[in-house]
Structures are given as C-alpha cells and as structure tokens.
Design a protein with these regions (language model features):
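PLP-dependent class I/II
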Residues: 1-180
Length: 180
C-alpha cells in the first residue's frame, strides 16, 4: 500500500513482539522486506525496523533503488546480537544453494558494489505516483496516498472486488482482487 511506518508504530510493534515472545517462551523473528526502502515521497525518512527490535532479518534488493528490473541482487541482513545469528546466516546460505539460486554475473555484482551510496533518479516515481493518484481520485476511486514505493492500491468501485476485476477484463485490464 505504500505505507511508511513511523518510529512510533515500529516502537509499538517491537513492544508487542517482545511481550508475545515472552508469553510464548521464545523469540519471534521479524522479517522486514525492504526492496522499496529508497523510494520514499515528500522527504519522508524510512526508519529501520532492526533499530527497534533485536530479532529482525532485513531483506533488501538493489533492483528497485538502482532501477535494475529483473536483476536478483540483494541481501538478507541479520541484526548483530540477534538470537541464533550464526545459525541463521548459515541456514540462509544453505537455502540459497538448495533452491538453485544462482549468483548474478560477477560484472553486475562488481558494478553494484560501487553503487552503495547512489540511487537512480527516483523522483520519477513520485511524479508518476502523483499523476496516477490525481487521475484515480478524479475518477472517483478511494485511494490512500502512498508514502513510498511505486504502487497505488485503489479501492474497487463496487463492493465485490472479484466482480470488479472481471468487469475490467472487458477493457483488456488485468487486475488482482483484494478484499483485505
């Protein structure tokens, strides 16, 4: 939905996870999937969930911030001091091998390693978001204005999202319904 969680929200979430971890007798891991981290609008800063909760795994992909669609190049970071840190790192390495995940070409890895402090011109995403947001709201769609990413999630114009998506097919539009 493009929501950027505030530090206050992440603090509350960390408190809940800590309480529930104690109640269950083991730590609950938070997996923070952050491929769109660098695409934030209106000067927003995206806080790092790992700064709020010690048992966090952070997933990141360079394909969004460097505008490299289709490139599967990124990382999973385990917060230092996370319970089972060594086991988690070893397990992720094994999963990568067992699933047949191949490393990107060396030249791509080398190029990305030199781009750690840069991004593509991400302002185009905000321009596109604003245009789409304005057009959708002008057409009567209920739309939450995203704080980041390049997705907009409008509410269907009729109650049954499946029926709405079927109607859209008549206009050669393929939509995915969601009633959540």
């Amino acid at each position: 939905t493009g929501v950027v969680y505030s530090a206050e929200t992440l603090t509350r979430m960390a408190d809940i996870l800590t309480q529930k971890s104690k109640a269950f007798g083991h730590n609950i891991f938070l997996v923070s999937d952050e491929p769109y981290r660098d695409i934030a609008f209106d000067g927003k800063t995206v806080p790092y969930p790992a700064a709020f909760y010690p048992h966090t795994l952070t997933c990141f992909s360079y394909s969004k911030s460097l505008s490299l669609p289709g490139e599967r190049l990124g990382y999973v970071a385990v917060r230092p001091g996370c319970e089972g840190e060594d086991i988690l790192v070893d397990m992720m390495s094994q999963i990568s091998r067992f699933t047949g995940h191949n490393c990107p070409p060396s030249i791509i890895q080398r190029a990305v390693s030199r781009c750690q402090k840069v991004t593509s011109d991400l302002s185009v995403y905000q321009t596109n978001m604003e245009l789409l947001y304005e057009k959708l709201t002008a057409l009567g769609f209920e739309v939450e204005r995203p704080g980041g990413t390049f997705y907009i999630f409008p509410k269907a114009l009729e109650e049954d999202a499946n029926a709405f998506c079927q109607k859209a097919r008549e206009f050669d539009l393929l939509l995915v319904p969601s009633d959540s």
